[in-house]
Amino acid sequence: MANEIVTTAQDRMKQSLGSLQRDLGHIRAGRANASLLDRVQVVYYGAPTPLNQLASITIPEARVLMVTPFDKSILKDIEKALYESDLGITPANDGSVIRLVIPMLTEERRRELVKEMGKYIESAKVAIRNIRRDAMDTAKKSEKAKEITEDDLKDLENNIQKVTDDAVKEADRLASIKEKELLDI
């Protein structure tokens, strides 16, 4: 029972860290990264469809993304979706592919992105602390129900705290990597 509580908490914390990593991947750092286009939806036959299902996305140069549609007839729809996205990148359509040149970030924009990143980090830490609280509550209920002893409860609480500390350290590590990436010119 005790190991199950810790394992469940650890798995949930890993999911929160995975979500954080995806969110940080969507923050544009002045370099081309295919994950920038993950959230772009193209209206295809009346239904919003993820761009990566309609086109291949390649990185021919450090600051250029190239979108090659599988079906050339939807080139205009893809271009429209890219214009309407909140990426702040103007697509260049050459008739068969769309090129996205990632502009260099200004110092002010870098600082804004670091602030945005801080919000993602904080929400991940809140999620981790909520998972810890849930695990601690479950452990205390188990002790009240006489499923574990008081000594086992203390050990379990220490294990849960260690898992939580490790998850918070990982979130901080991810944050420092992304911040370094954002602030490097």
Swiss-Prot record:
Q: Which GO terms describe its cellular component?
A: cytoplasm
Alphabetic keyword roster: Cytoplasm, Protein biosynthesis
Tree of life domain: Bacteria
Example GO biological process:
translational termination
Gene3D superfamilies per the UniProt record, alphabetical: 3.30.1360.40, Ribosome-recycling factor
Task: Assign the protein's first listed, main location to one coarse class.
Answer: cytoplasm
Keyword RNA-binding carried by entry: no
InterPro entries annotated for this entry?
Answer: Ribosome_recyc_fac, Ribosome_recyc_fac_dom, RRF_sf
Q: Which subcellular locations apply to this protein?
A: Cytoplasm
Among Pfam families, the record links this protein to:
RRF (PF01765)
Gene Ontology terms for molecular function: ribosomal large subunit binding
The protein's matches in PANTHER family, at most eight in alphabetical order, are given as: MITOCHONDRIAL RIBOSOME RECYCLING FACTOR PSEUDO 1, RIBOSOME RECYCLING FACTOR
- Report the sequence similarity comment from the record: Belongs to the RRF family.
Record's function text: Responsible for the release of ribosomes from messenger RNA at the termination of protein biosynthesis. May increase the efficiency of translation by recycling ribosomes from one round of translation to another.
Please state what the protein is called.
Ribosome-recycling factor
